[in-house]
Amino acid sequence: MKKFPLIPFVFFLGLLLVFFACNQNNKPKNEEETILKGSTSVLVDETLLPIVEDQVEVFESLYDAKIQINPKSEAETILALSKDTSKIAILSRKLNPEEEKVFSSKKIKPRTTVFATDAIAFISNQRNKDTLIALQDVVNFLKGMPNSKIKGLVFDNPNSSTVRYMNELAGTKELPSKGIFSFKTNEEVIQFVAENEGMIGVVGVNWLMEPSLKMRPIVDKITILSVKGIGKTDYFAPTQNNLAEKKYPLARELYIINCQGYSGLGMGFASFIAGEVGQRITLKSGLLPVKMPGRNIKVRKQIK
């Protein structure tokens, strides 16, 4: 039997493998990701987690896509976004000019899409008789002035959007050392208030509108307080109607910020949230959609 030389064959096989590897390396990283297909991750302000979970669940059921949700405090979310831990984020504010410069240096222009109006809610133990609270009293408490109606303010995280929002409102740079309690999540805040009378919790309202099965018994033990705005006379609860009429004083817009720089799932998910289906999900969640979904009314010519 004639034997073929082994070395040329091995050499040829090696060249073939190198060629194949080079072709694989030259493929675009995002080749398998489109606006409605593939996988990605989304950074989420923890105070907004429930509405994002609802949106992602439906999006994944409709498209061949997988979105990993990474809940963090607002400060941690923005830091992770700037470090490319993920290139999509959902926040209760836009990026400021300094934050946008980080992406400009990478030749990426963040695309910001507003999709809902949320609210910061004050909650108390259900055993508390008072269901009203004046925003001025809360501001004064944040400035170190004691108030007989407020035993303590309970926040989710020192780096959270609720803390940043309330500090900006009060004109303070940091929370006072006395009468302030903080945890890691909104769930922990709700549970602490449910177990302690006299405490006022500060949470994202979407944690209260459609609580999980685990949280429902706990939410049943708290009261969502109606708030009187600074310089106002009437009290308003954080309902969809009051948000729409701009009566509730602690409303805030929600944004999805896409820093992918290409046509990927960030673009597709943003379009979904701001579109018909996403806005219906927002409406059902208890938040205020940017665009009120239309209703199809069938008119019958004859009544049977």
Q: What does each of the following model-derived ranges do?
A:
Residues 4-5, 22-64, 74-75, 79-82, ...:
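Exported/periplasmic ABC-transporter solute-binding proteins
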Residues 1-11:
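Bacterial N-terminal signal peptides that target proteins for export
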Residues 9-20:
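Bacterial N-terminal signal peptides
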Residues 75-106, 211:
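Pocket-flanking alpha-helical
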Residues 88, 95, 110-113, 118-120:
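Short, glycine-/small- and polar/acidic-enriched structural segments
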